[in-house]
Amino acid sequence: MYEYKAKVIKIVDGDTVDFDVDLGFNITIRVRGRLMDVDTPERGHEDWKLATQELRMLIASERDASGYVTMTTTKTGKYGRWLVKVGNINKTLAEKWPYRTAGNA
């Protein structure tokens, strides 16, 4: 696993987030991250707003004084999004919305 400091730019839905990832040496890249082990309702489905709002609150509690979260990742999923873990957020969301099949999207 690789660990990075990142700023959350946009919460796409309850399991997808856009980050500006700090690579060091004043180098930052923007990536779309998919929370590992979590599968929240998609936009337009029941509980979509609830899942998205819960993620928003969890991210707010994970931010450090500079506004960064710590994310870990090793690979991209089948749709090109980085599969990420952000503090304890994945574990908390997976209790309500676990990813039910092998692998991850």
Residue ranges, per PLM feature:
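Small beta-barrel nucleic-acid-binding modules, primarily SNase/OB-fold domains
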Residues: M1-A105
